[in-house]
Amino acid sequence: MKEIKLSNAGGLSRRDALRRAAGAGALISLSPFAGFGVSSAEAAEEALGKFPKHPQWKFVFVNHVTTNPFWVPLRYGAEDACALFGTTFQWTGSEKSIATEMVDAFNTAVSGKADGIAVSLVDPSAFNDPVEKALAAGIPAVSYNADAKGNKRLCYIGQDLFQSGKALGQRIVEGVGEGQVAGFIATPGQLNIQPRMDGAREAIKESGKNIKLDEIATGPTVNEELSRIQAYYTGHPDIKGMFAVDAGSTEGVGKTMAANKLHEKGIHAGGFDLLPTTLDAISKGDLDFTIDQQPYLQGFYTVMVLFVYKISGGLSGLAEINTGLKFVTKGNVDPYLSTQSRFEGSSSEEKVLTRSGPIS
């Protein structure tokens, strides 16, 4: 891979100059413990791409758990896309998955005349009217990470959640065979994770195996999730498997497996997303696998879709984008552990990553 550098008289590359303008303040707001409602720093007037001069459009991301560490790579993706296209974004919503707080944030974006709004549609109907109001005001509204049938959002960027759940269920069938397994879910009913649980349940049913899947609510914060998972295992020591459909619960499963040496007892475990502790648990054998949904792309592509829609006058840009699923196991986890990058949210450093060897 060859990196082409654009130089200027001041010694900074054009990209570096733009990055310093666009990213200096934004990186601070990327802490998973930062409050919601934080804007990215103002981007440079000129975009990196070969685009006609355009206004510095501001896009608003409305999220359901704004301080959860899962979102760090998604926000890096949005930030990098903003630097590329000469736009800015604001991160707002709810810290604890409260739909009314998200609706308030969405309506504030509409009244503030945002240039585009992206919302995680975790509720089946709460955002129907707000989205229609945004569209009526000429503001493009798209969904990311979670989608809702019947909502008039213009497009969805994220994983096919039901199919990823079926893939999880198939792994459960392969690993467990029969018996009782736990399915941990942060917020039952919410559309960013409930479809995964439903997909897993369907796959287990289709297998015909004698496997009972218990759905266990863990809560919207990491500490709650770990506490409830540990408590569940204490009350169900004969469990055959422990699985989760969200990042925090997966992390909690890994910690519970390690604390009780459950892998040595033949208990299987797995879940979703690439939190550093989850990857470490896979490396140590406490988790069998995790499923990646590429949150960086969910942030990057969402900004890209809104930008192209704006710059084309609404003629182009809209696309249903599936950010895919990939199983990360002990056999392929090493590159994730040895590489620190914005793409996985493990580093804020901007750098080109290189690879070698055949692609499988």
Please place each PLM-identified region on the residue numbering.
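N-terminal secretory signal peptides
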Residues: 1-16, 28-40
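C-terminal segment of N-terminal export signals and the immediately downstream linker at the start
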Residues: 34-60
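Hinge/cleft segment of the Venus flytrap/periplasmic-binding protein
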Residues: 45-55, 192, 203-207, 301-360
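Short, hydrophobic alpha-helical segments
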Residues: 110, 172-177, 233, 302, ...
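Hydrophobic alpha-helical
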Residues: 119-135, 200, 214, 218-281
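Exported/periplasmic ABC-transporter solute-binding proteins
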Residues: 240-241, 247, 254-297, 303-324, ...
